[in-house]
Amino acid sequence: MSKRRRESDESDASTRKRRQDSSVGPVDRLSSLSNELLLHILSFLPISSLSVCQRLSRRFSALSGDSELWKRQYYTQWVRPRARRLASVRRSSLPNKSEYSPKVSTWLDHGHLAADGKVTNWKGQYRLRHNWSRGSCRLSEVEFPPRPYPPVLAKLCAGIVFTADADHGLQAWAAKDPAICLAKVLFSKGPESSKICPTALAVSDLKGSQEIVVGFENGHYNRYIMETETSQLEFRSCHKGSGEEAVTAMAISSPYLLMVSHDKLLSLHHIHPGKTSEVRELASLKADNVIAPMTLSLRTSNSEIVATIVYSFFHIGCGWSLGIQELHFSKTGQQLQSRLTSTVDSQYGIRPLRNLPSSTKRRHSTMADPRGQSETEVPVMPSILHQQPPTSMSYSHPYLLTSHADNTLTMYLVVSNSNDLFVRGGQRLWGHTSSVSTVQVTNRGKAISVGSRGDEIRIWELEMAIPSLGTSRPFNEESSIQVNPENKEEDLDFDSPSKRSRPEDRDFEIDSDLEQDFPSSQQCVGFDDERVLLLREKTVGTQLLECYDFT
């Protein structure tokens, strides 16, 4: 007869078994899987988990950094939400098969990333967009010589910053490192050897090169070509403008050039491609009511050229308003039509009568109801009232953006079709804590605004404001992002010249007696997908080119 096992013996055995199991540790069920299976599993993880996986081992670091994983994350975070937003604005629906597609050429406004032979670092691209969405960047500065008169002109195009002033001529700088001067050409190569001041600058991006046009105070303008591959800046030709006074504004869309002189003469020119100096004036018009600030725009199609001039004027009812004149030319320079509109109706909250002839619209003092059922009286008081002229304006079709001294911006949507030209709605944009000195907007609705003190730069996505146009629904500060350089306080000290980059050929000393506090002025040189460049006058005789890098 067998003896019964004691209960104490059984408990001891179970305890030893648990200890053995605990010494083995958790079972690793992932390392034995193939890379294909692991990539499929990682594709379901959020960004925070992918970042953790990169710190586990070399294998997981390589797998979690796979470009296709980040490409899908990029699409989910940035591409698809924008497509949904635009579909709701246009009152359309997305196709049923609008899920992720590996073909970047099918993504909205991402064709530049699908160029032949171009390999995109999707993790870096995701980081770039993430930094833009949070305003995170690094700030670097380049100090320029004492401010000449007129001040330095600057433009950003295809990763190159072009500056123009009377002392140093036309210079090209690398946007990645603005302290590096790529090329330089003095203005004395023109027919007049005397020093003249540049008053306007325009740049157009060509295949493998950039075309630069500089306008001067004597009404002349010079043409230059910058070869991207060799970084050679070459003077091409000098021409006399249509006006007798200084060139005040220019817009270029090669091979066409639009310019305005100080005597309010608007002229359109055709620039012959190649190394020849032939420039033909296509049209010239005299303007009587153009008041600064103003902006020019030039668009081309297969059949016509559309030149647009936006200017400010005072309206007795709603204060300072904007006038928009659109001129249509054929390729030979024949004027096809001229159309004029303003922002007055939008400032009153009136929707345009698009179904009536333009002559009938001017005779009507009432406005048809949006549903077409009845007529509504024109409001007595405007919803948008500006007592002071705009401090700056920017127009990139269809977006028109102005800045004001009352800490606000105003956005308009310009609609131009074969039958009509009108402004759809107007929306005040809030978020700045001081007067806004300058704005720039792209045709995709991305905008940069700079406060008058220079320490507040905000990023706007104006596509999000389209649904609120013409309504009382505000577009608040939460809809914009303030740029916050990570290294501004720790690396940069405006009072310490030793902490600023300075080009070698621009070494100079500033008299300490002149260093006193003055209101800073700034000019937004431009921005692209990776950076914002700002030209700022900090103190007397001190000009800084600031580069805000989001990479």
Language-model features: locations:
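Short loop/turn segments that connect beta-strands within the blades of beta-propeller domains
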Residues: 56, 157, 166, 208, ...
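Loop/turn-rich, solvent-exposed surfaces of beta-rich toroidal or solenoidal domains
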Residues: 396-410, 437-462, 466-467
